[in-house]
């Protein structure tokens, strides 16, 4: 009898996260109004080194402010708009961001 070994470490994405070549789309748990429009999903582009450096300057040593600046830039929202998101949806954005910047093969 031959035994077949299957690699079960393949990571699957949650149904609320869609990965593309250019970024991720995050489906929100709670719809929110952005610029007067009811929104149920946000698209985050992949960050560049310039994005990261600009957010570091904007944060001026404050990690939370740096993250808000970076996420706002990548999603196209102001800090005030990001702050209106429910925490669960902000965590989804964060998960999407780390999916973009972490190595797939590590």
Label the model's feature ranges.
Residues 2-106:
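Short, surface-exposed, charged amphipathic helix/loop patches that serve as local interaction elements
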